[in-house]
Swiss-Prot record:
Residues 60-102 are annotated as: Disordered. The lineage of its organism: Eukaryota, Metazoa, Chordata, Craniata, Vertebrata. This is Proteasome activator complex subunit 1. It comes from Rattus norvegicus (Rat). Implicated in immunoproteasome assembly and required for efficient antigen processing. The PA28 activator complex enhances the generation of class I binding peptides by altering the cleavage pattern of the proteasome. Residues 68-98 have a biased composition (Basic and acidic residues). One of its GO terms (biological process) is regulation of proteasomal protein catabolic process. PANTHER family: PROTEASOME ACTIVATOR COMPLEX SUBUNIT 1 (PTHR10660:SF5), PROTEASOME REGULATOR PA28 (PTHR10660).
Amino acid sequence: MATLRVHPEAQAKVDVFREDLCSKTENLLGSYFPKKISELDAFLKEPALNEANLSNLKAPLDIPVPDPVKEKEKEERKKQQEKEEKDEKKKGDEDDKGPPCGPVNCNEKIVVLLQRLKPEIKDVIEQLNLVTTWLQLQIPRIEDGNNFGVAVQAKVFELMTSLHTKLEGFQTQISKYFSERGDAVAKAAKQPHVGDYRQLVHELDEAEYQEIRLMVMEIRNAYAVLYDIILKNFEKLKKPRGETKGMIY
């Protein structure tokens, strides 16, 4: 029979890690998760996340609308200059110039909400990772028979994996919002006479506001679902095959 030799000192360190992890996890379930559920539920009820009129989220776009007559004259002068221009480097530098407007700021209302949301995303992913590791360390040696508790562990682990995937997607979604908004602002600045690009910026802000509320809700629900399913199945998760004492029939 193949065996792996483990130094007692190394095994002792692993045992300390396991005990510390179990203690942290039980503390999370006993006090931290209920606390976060309550905090996030209160956050969802704040006026900042319950704006009935989404047009109030509109951020000013400091992009002046050009005068058609002046723009036409400017375009004609530019064409004439390009014909006369022979220095390719100078022409390239001219093409790289930004739009003729000042800096366009982010939507401060959205940014403030995201500054509160991002630490919550980081926190729930870390806590979920901790609880997932705890669950994996409870999985017993693979044997035939009496595997109902192990099946319960597998089902809960599947739920945790699904939650982790969803929560990680929140970080990507936030980055995507800024990327898309930046593109929309750039288009609005480059073609200020096109009202659709201006409106697109506001539409993206409104959509992100609704996404923020949904993300807070999903984080709260993640804590609640984890707390509920682990509490209901705690014995099966911690001792999937029950007590090790022999059973008499």
